[in-house]
Amino acid sequence: MVQSERYLIYIDKYIFIGKYKGKKNMFCVFTQAQEYDEDAKLWFKLGTIYLNNDKILSVKNVKGLKEYKKIIFP
């Protein structure tokens, strides 16, 4: 289970990005267990991305994120 601020960006049906508390350039990529329970508040961490001026520096342990070439953060 991942604790994160409610700074979520919807990428596709089940994949979101959330900001780590207190970490400026570090975001975690995770999925919600909607396929099991629509009301579930369970999140499974898929990996971490590191940003600098909204440019992705590196992606660690994120499967299926290669097709998302540009991720815009509010």
PLM ranges: what are they?
Residues M1-P74:
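Conserved RNA-binding domains used in RNP assembly and mRNA/RNA metabolism
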